[in-house]
Amino acid sequence: MTRISWKENRVLSIETRKGVYVVGQMLKQPYIRFYNMFTTESSPNNVNTIKLTVLFTAAITRQFLRYSQVYVLKDATPDIREIDSDIWINQFSGSRKVIAYQGSGEEIGCMILGNKPGGLLVKKNLWWIPTTEQPIRLHPSGVFDEIICSDIPLTANDIIDKYELTGLCVFPYTNERLYLCSLYNKSVDPYKDLTFNRNLPDNYRLAVEIISGGFNDKKRNEILSTYFTDSQI
């Protein structure tokens, strides 16, 4: 694949699992807004993102763009409105081990961020730009602007489902997450569900295996071939 340079409001088609593509739009770097439009065409014509439903907006890594199959939709119409939420979920400091699918006989252990379940509800304007008067964000951490709730209840499903984690999207986890979004016709995030100690459906298993990183080279190559035959990661 040709390396894709960053251009604000550039509309993209990104492969999730092999042969299934999602529409995304570059915003202020490094954020991409993903839409609930999935297709088996790598380059659908005349896409108008103004008419599409947003799945989620998240920060992505260069690694995600480098190893994903990405196509620029040159005839697409971007939505240039700043419609993205400024409310996010920030995980607690530290890390911990969690066990997914306990009691199933096929448990998967994962190390995830956060020294305890849950997280903070925070305000973070993705469109913010440093200035001489305000070179860093307002919160002392410099990561977000302010804390709205210092400990989101694990039962606050409306909040948990509505807001994104502040972490970065990587390949191939995000690709698998987007594929799951296509199955559920909404935004889902196995990593966030692990963060909040939720029970996981069985079709999240591949995503959890990717999160765990606990496989040998042979298994790793098998997982990668699920996504891209010629992936060189």
Q: Model segments located where?
A:
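Extended aliphatic helical segments
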Residues: 11, 20-23, 47, 54, ...
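Alpha-helical structural elements
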Residues: 1, 51, 59-62, 66, ...
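Short N-terminal edge-element motif at the start of the domain
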Residues: 1-57
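Generic serine detector
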Residues: 5, 13, 42-43, 53, ...
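A eukaryote-biased signal for long
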Residues: 102, 107-233
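Long, low-complexity intrinsically disordered regions
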Residues: 56-125
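Intrinsic disorder/low-complexity segments enriched in polar/charged and small flexible residues
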Residues: 8, 90, 129-130
